[in-house]
Amino acid sequence: MIFNEYEEFCKKMDECIEKYKGKFGCIVTFNGFVREYDLKDGEKVPSKGMKIDEDILEKLKLVIEEAKNKFDVIDILFYHNTGFLSIGERIASIAVFARHRKEGFEALEYIINEMKKYH
């Protein structure tokens, strides 16, 4: 499930914890923020922020479905901010509910790597 409002993501996290109680062994999470610099050719270059188009949300829905099909996980929640993001702003939050940490971490790594293709 994908969200473009962080508060909705947090609310759904709480709901899923109750819904899946006893079924999951871990929730593997990731939170990404805009850095004050970018790396270009190994050099630190000051950042002015980043712009994220709303069409990324549709692409990320597909990534989530792919991850659910590829890895043995219970559920995936994904928040992604859009518009112009300033330094320090949250870009994305991901929560993978899994029976075991191995599958949870593998699914999370896959999602992050796919997400980075669109940034």
From Swiss-Prot:
Disulfide bonds: none
Gene Ontology cellular component list: cytosol
Alphabetical GO biological process terms: Mo-molybdopterin cofactor biosynthetic process
Family designation: To Synechocystis PCC 6803 slr0903.
The protein's name: Uncharacterized protein MJ0717
Species the sequence originates in: Methanocaldococcus jannaschii (strain ATCC 43067 / DSM 2661 / JAL-1 / JCM 10045 / NBRC 100440)
